[in-house]
Swiss-Prot record:
Keywords: Hydrolase, Protease, Repeat, Secreted, Signal, Thiol protease
Function: This major extracellular protein may be involved in the invasion of non-professional phagocytic cells by Listeria.
Superkingdom assignment: Bacteria
Cell compartment(s), UniProt: Cell surface; Secreted
Family according to the record: Belongs to the peptidase C40 family.
EC top class named in words: hydrolase
Protein name: Probable endopeptidase p60
Comment on protein domains: LysM domains are thought to be involved in peptidoglycan binding.
Length: 484
């Protein structure tokens, strides 16, 4: 009798345990096809990217066609997960996506609690003792241990406690976090909202400022800021006033075009005619009557050569040499004036057109580079996916191809083909808008867009972001630069 009771009690206990346990996910195998992403698979299977990565021991979001993945059809019971920030600074937004406003930025290494995971891979987190917001899950590490979801009543108590907290406690929190977090919002916000201070003409350097950060904030290049302020290096100091007016960059090219090309075109024709006609008038006395029939035109035009020396003085060096050679030919030989005029005009026009075209080429090059950098910055924070062509997700060469296409420039699809299609340049020659290439050991395998000062924007495992081309993980794979 006692054995029966024990058996019944044990069976009942097992039944109760089964009904009380969290929902057990049923696993299925998915074979990756071309174009698949972890996020897309997670959506179709009703699970999360983190769950797939944990089930398959994945450390990145990279997957390849033919790869088999174990995928849970149902997400396990809700749980809170403690994670750490892997980025140097991480923007916290009011909603799940880069289109939402930035609340603040938190420093790398900060521990946060993941409350929920959205379908696009973003997490709702709790940080700084109860504050909430949304971050891109790619910038969080999975080192912390998961903890069960707290009961609803306890969550309400925590919220109430924060709202009714005494002023003294609030002041203490501010003092403890001010030094660590004050510079963060400036750097993070200026990367994505550069138009805020666009009308400013100068900037007083504050603690934590860098030339690169200021270039992003005001929408100008690092080279422009250094040029406008006669800086020979990127070192700046607190209190220093820097010129950051963007329109100053367009003044110089226009002045060069106006002073070189038009001046040569206006002065070329009069100089040749005056010199040639003077020689004709000198020799007509020695020629036959047949030649003198053309002389009546000479007195009218011969009165003009007097100002010629001052006119030639204002011309550029190329025109002065041309006129001297023409006069020598006319003195020594009786070369017809038509031939002399033809040769002089040809030389002068060639020089003028060359100068004008060079100025135009420089303007077009600067305009294209600015358009490329502006377009590249629009996609900061977007997710990486193998084979991604944009505009929501990218891989490295898909990103560069998309950005350049928006600027009206066509690139091949792969990083290797893009490398082959560019002109090789040295790092000292590289300018913002050039491409920078890397080789992991099997040929060109990564490409980014150079923005100057040793920085690039690229689509990598952690999404579209800025990276130091000589930094850890990049410098040893750097191949070089290419110009389209």
């Amino acid at each position: 009798m006692n054995m029966k009771k024990a058996t019944i009690a044990a069976t009942a206990g097992i039944a109760v345990t089964a009904f009380a346990a969290p929902t057990i996910a049923s696993a299925s195998t998915v074979v990756v096809e071309a174009g698949d992403t972890l996020w897309g698979i997670a959506q179709s299977k009703g699970t999360t990217v983190d769950a797939i990565k944990k089930a398959n021991n994945l450390t990145t979001d990279k997957i390849v066609p033919g790869q088999k993945l174990q995928v849970n059809n149902e997400v396990a019971a809700a749980e809170k997960t403690e994670k750490s920030v892997s980025a140097t600074w991480l923007n916290v937004r009011s909603g799940a996506g880069v289109d939402n406003s930035i609340i603040t930025s938190i420093k790398g290494g900060t521990k946060v609690t993941v409350e929920t995971t959205e379908s696009n891979g973003w997490h709702k987190i709790t940080y700084n003792d109860g504050k909430t917001g949304f971050v891109n899950g790619k910038y969080l590490t999975d080192k912390a241990v998961s903890t069960p979801v707290a009961p609803t009543q306890e969550v309400k108590k925590e919220t109430t406690t924060q709202q009714a907290a005494p002023a003294a406690e609030t002041k203490t929190e501010v003092k403890q976090t001010t030094q660590a977090t004050t510079p963060a919002p400036k750097v993070a916000e200026t990367k994505e909202t550069p138009v805020v201070d666009q009308n400013a003409t100068t900037h007083a350097v504050k603690s934590g400022d860098t030339i690169w950060a200021l270039s992003v904030k005001y929408g100008v290049s690092v080279q422009d800021i250094m040029s406008w302020n006669n800086l020979s290096s990127s070192s700046i100091y607190v209190g220093q006033k820097l010129a950051i007016k963007q329109t100053a960059n367009t003044a110089t090219p226009k002045a060069e075009v106006k002073t070189e090309a038009p001046a040569a075109e206006k002065q070329a024709a009069p100089v040749v005619k005056e010199n040639t006609n003077t020689n004709t008038a000198t020799t007509e006395k020695k020629e036959t009557a047949t030649q003198q029939q053309t002389a009546p035109k000479a007195p009218t035009e011969a009165a003009k050569p007097a100002p010629a020396p001052s006119t030639n003085t204002n011309a550029n060096k190329t025109n002065t040499n041309t006129n001297t050679n023409t006069n020598t030919n006319n003195t020594n030989t009786n070369t017809p004036s038509k031939n002399t005029n033809t040769n002089s005009n040809t030389n002068t026009n060639t020089n003028s057109n060359t100068n004008a075209n060079q100025g135009s080429s420089n303007n077009n090059s600067n305009s294209s580079a600015s358009a490329i950098i502006a377009e590249a910055q629009k996609h900061l924070g977007k997710a990486y996916s193998w084979g991604g062509n944009g505009p929501t997700t990218f891989d490295c060469s898909g990103y560069t191809k998309y950005v350049f296409a928006k600027a009206g420039i066509s690139l091949p699809r792969t990083s290797g083909a893009q490398y082959a299609s560019t002109t090789r340049i040295s790092e000292s020659q590289a300018k913002p808008g050039d491409l920078v290439f890397f080789d992991y050991g099997s040929g060109i395998s990564h490409v980014g867009i150079y923005v100057g000062n040793g920085q690039m924007i690229n689509a990598q495992d952690n999404g579209v972001k800025y990276d130091n081309i000589h930094g850890s993980g990049w410098g040893k794979y750097l191949v070089g630069f290419g110009r389209v």
